[in-house]
């Protein structure tokens, strides 16, 4: 990794891209400390440490939500809009057809996604206002103050969408991923400080710290191993004349084990948090009190039923998203059109059935590991002394995936530069 960065720094074009990325990330990190006016951030501390979806959003926003800064929503509206658009492409034939029209179709879908992200940011901004008002974090509550809060959050989120595009075009990696990556990295020193504070206060001992760090390293190693792991389906192509002899082409279809884990966890987290969010709007209702406080409620993070349901939903969404991402029927059809076949499997419907069976197995393995990643913060909060420490397997997964993707992109561009130098 370090050698790749060192070699990339020697190439002027890549060095310029790296510097552009650092510059744009610095702008957005400075903006994450610009507060929205009229907010008492001290009252939000318990909210962001309560676990669940809000804690996760605070983590991927680099603590911007707990500070309720201009970038409190981060790129969350854009992520949600992207996921919704991917699902709508399955349900709406016109959108599905648009996605198959090459660059022009993708640009149109991207434009729709951005408009949808702005709409979602308005809804999330107003929802954030309701939440902070419930926790008594508003210094003023006039209509103009509400308008300024919503407007500030929407403008901040829209600016980050634009900034992410600039990083993608002028910098290194995917802009949205880089923003989330930088936010999680920025939260690591605070995590270390929280552990140190617990140790000094006598709430934990050095043995617990060593075990915690060891578990984090083991989780990191497991995520790296499974992220790089893939199930390869061998594909052969019909004989073609190459000079005076016949040659048979070979290739493979790589299926990532945990490629859809992040989205699956976000889906499951959203479903699990939705009843609790609705219940918070009706604190005096008996059904709301049962959802938030009953030991038999599957939406109460302190119960074993919550953990079980969370795992089931994560495995299901991993399978679901794997199916809609790879589409066995289209894979089989494209393979047949290119005169390709899987050894020992007949073309057409048998190939589709075979691909679906392999995808189901891969999705099950990936879903189980995704479920383990998802419940790590819940287990830490319920059964350890590290309740106040923001630590999640999902953040580790994001860090690993973005780091490896950046290295792959730099390696590819370095290879292209070497070839260009050779040709010139």
Predicted features and spans:
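N-terminal cationic and glycine-rich segments that engage phosphates or anionic surfaces
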Residues: 1-99, 104-424
């Amino acid at each position: 990794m370090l050698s790749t960065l060192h070699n990339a720094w020697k190439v002027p074009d890549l060095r310029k891209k790296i510097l552009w990325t650092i510059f744009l990330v610095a702008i957005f990190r400075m903006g994450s400390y610009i507060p929205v006016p009229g907010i008492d951030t001290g009252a939000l501390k318990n909210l962001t440490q309560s676990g669940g979806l809000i804690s996760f959003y605070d983590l991927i926003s680099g603590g911007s939500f707990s500070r309720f800064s201009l970038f409190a929503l981060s790129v969350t509206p854009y992520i949600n809009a992207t996921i919704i658009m991917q699902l709508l492409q399955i349900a709406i034939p016109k959108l599905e057809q648009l996605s198959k029209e090459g660059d022009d179709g993708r640009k149109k879908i991207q434009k729709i996604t951005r408009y949808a992200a702005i709409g979602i940011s308005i809804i999330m901004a107003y929802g954030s206002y309701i939440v902070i008002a419930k926790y008594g974090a508003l210094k003023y509550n006039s209509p103009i103050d509400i308008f300024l809060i919503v407007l500030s959050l929407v403008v901040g989120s829209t600016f980050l969408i634009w900034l992410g595009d600039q990083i993608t075009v002028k910098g290194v990696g995917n802009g949205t991923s880089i923003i989330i990556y930088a936010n999680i990295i920025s939260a690591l020193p605070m995590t270390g400080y929280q552990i140190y504070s617990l140790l000094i206060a006598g709430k934990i001992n050095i043995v617990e710290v060593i075990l915690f760090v060891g578990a984090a390293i083991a989780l990191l190693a497991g995520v790296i191993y499974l992220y790089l792991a893939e199930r390869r389906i061998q594909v052969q192509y019909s004989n073609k004349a190459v000079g005076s002899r016949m040659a048979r082409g070979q290739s493979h279809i790589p299926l990532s084990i945990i490629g859809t884990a992040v989205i699956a966890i976000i889906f499951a987290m959203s479903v699990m948090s939705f009843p609790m969010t609705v219940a918070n709007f009706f604190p005096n209702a008996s059904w709301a009190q049962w959802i938030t406080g009953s030991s038999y409620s599957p939406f109460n993070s302190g119960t074993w039923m919550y953990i079980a349901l969370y795992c089931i939903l994560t495995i299901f969404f991993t399978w679901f998203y794997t199916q809609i991402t790879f589409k066995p029927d289209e894979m089989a059809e494209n393979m047949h059109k290119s005169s390709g076949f899987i050894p020992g499997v007949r073309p057409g419907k048998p190939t589709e059935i075979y691909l679906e069976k392999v995808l189901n197995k891969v999705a099950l393995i990936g879903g189980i590991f995704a479920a383990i990643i998802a419940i790590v913060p819940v287990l830490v909060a319920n059964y350890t002394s590290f309740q106040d420490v923001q630590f999640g397997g999902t953040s580790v997964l994001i860090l690993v995936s973005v780091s490896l993707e950046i290295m792959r992109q730099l390696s590819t561009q370095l290879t292209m530069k070497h070839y260009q130098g050779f040709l010139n």
